[in-house]
């Protein structure tokens, strides 16, 4: 068993990306069990077979990266993975659902949202982050 506590945290972004691939290759080649501690969600998602999300010393959820991303156990888990972060808002903002204020929260990831034509919605874009392959709009 290999234990690693944030081994890539002090490296620059390019080297960190290169070493993620190399560490995963070595781990697969050796067939070794590795317990890898990180606060970097990209490291967790790309390197792990299973991820454990902790809060206050307690395990909130254990599962594959895809399971945790698509079916988080709670708001804490949902807010830990995804770039950009999940959008959370009170369910009472959804018209016509009859949900009492403060009882439920809706989480929406950006890949599941569509920008409405101006005739059917309103909003104002405050900032745009151009990232090359994608752009993040901030409302």
Predicted regions and their residues:
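ABC ATPase nucleotide-binding domains
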Residues: 1-76
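Structural detector for hydrophobic anchor residues on beta-strands
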Residues: 50, 89, 119-121
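Short glycine/serine/threonine-biased micro-segments
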Residues: 50, 61, 80, 105, ...
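Short, conserved beta-strand edge motifs with alternating hydrophobic and charged residues
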Residues: 54, 80-82, 90, 105-109
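Residues located in well-ordered beta-strands
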Residues: 64, 76, 90-92, 122-126
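C-terminal boundary and immediately downstream tail of ABC-type ATPase nucleotide-binding domains
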Residues: 70-96
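Non-catalytic connector elements of ABC transporters
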Residues: 84, 95-139
């Amino acid at each position: 068993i290999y234990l690693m506590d944030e081994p890539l945290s002090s490296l620059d972004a390019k080297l960190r990306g290169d070493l993620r691939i190399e560490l995963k290759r070595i781990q697969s080649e050796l067939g070794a069990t590795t317990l890898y501690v990180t606060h970097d969600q990209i490291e967790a998602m790309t390197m792990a077979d299973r991820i454990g999300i902790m809060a206050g010393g307690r395990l909130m959820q254990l599962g594959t990266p895809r399971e945790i991303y698509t079916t988080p156990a709670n708001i804490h888990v949902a807010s830990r993975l995804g770039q950009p972060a999940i959008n959370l808002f009170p369910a009472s903002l959804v018209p016509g659902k009859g949900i009492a204020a403060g009882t439920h929260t809706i989480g929406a990831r950006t890949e599941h949202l569509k920008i409405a034509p101006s005739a059917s919605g309103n909003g104002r874009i405050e900032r745009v982050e151009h990232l090359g392959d994608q752009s993040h709009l901030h409302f």
